[in-house]
Amino acid sequence: AIWNGLGLAAWLVDADTLDTGAELSDAEKARRERTRQSGLSGIIQYQWSPDGKALLFPLGGKLFLYTLDAPANEAVRELPVSGEFIDARISPQGRYVAYVQGQNLHVIDLRSGKSRALTEDGGGVIHNGEAEFVAQEEMDRERGYWWAPDDSYIAFERYDETHVPVIKRMEVYPDRTEVIEQRYPAAGKNNVAIKLGLVSPADGNMRWIDLGEETDVYLARVDWLPDSKHLSYQLEQRNQQQLDLKRVDVASLEQQTLLTERSNTWINLSSDLRFLDDGSFIWASERSGYLHLYRYDRDGTLTHPISKGNWNIDKLLGVDATNGRVYVQSNHDYVPDTQVYALALDGSSASAPQRISKEDGTHTATFAEDASFYLDTFSHPETPPQVSLRKADGSLIQWIERN
């Protein structure tokens, strides 16, 4: 079903009419366990197209595209994917759908309706377009490929498990127990060998980014810059005491180290990196003993802290570069609470964030891409979860679920 903005819901697809009841692959089972979706069935995930006119969703081992303004008998389109697949996603411009099948990266051209493999060496110990076990389990990185904003390239991870030891683990079911062999990089043992590639969805042209001579490292994060001409990646040493942020020129593959984060203990990874249109960026760091945000210019020179003091940022929620505002989640005012705050991008309010959320309790916010409004889920020991749509200043636009 879909909420139409007027407080009403419209039924789109009946999962029972499409679901074949196909058995999930081991990879998909593992993904659902990590996202706490293992006990669910039917349509459990979906993605909007960039123009908001279509929905992509997997169901019963098949992949479907639902077009909202199409006639009822033409609205649901089954895409040409045969067999088990994972991680299907629409490209930012809506031209393609990428997915991983047989440990290879594939792409569907939605104009022609044709599907083809972008990599062909996957299988066995070789994986393309997937995040390795450690990345998924310990680094909060489930993705193994990343679309350029203009659809020109896909950056993807290729990893080789050849030298990773094999262990045995048990899977216990109500009627049986199964022994599963799995490659597991225990402490002191070999890790996977990682490569970072760039491939064109249009012609399959592929190139590789030089990750350096040190091979016992983690590919922690990959992010495209808004111009689609540059890619960034974060490389962490295995002892987790050094993290490098690098920027790659896509045309020449020349690289620049923008910053290096070091710690005598370990570095907590963050997903709060944001590149702005001018090439400058926002970086999250615990260097002060608290997690705060810092503004860097395009060459990696620190210009100023965006937040500071004896309090933590929990999460970067959104950036409104036009109006110079940054929105974060924090417990700045009262430790048991989770609230939404606004900070000035120029650092002028670094020590005094402005609270946006109204009620005391727990607020979980999802901001629009331009940070002009957000979806707020609020709860309190005496109040069940309430969902509302709000302007960036916290004022109410519409209740979704007043509860």
What are these regions (language model features)?
Residues 1-385, 389-390:
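Beta-propeller folds
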Residues 399-403:
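N-terminal cap/lid segment of alpha/beta-hydrolase-fold proteins
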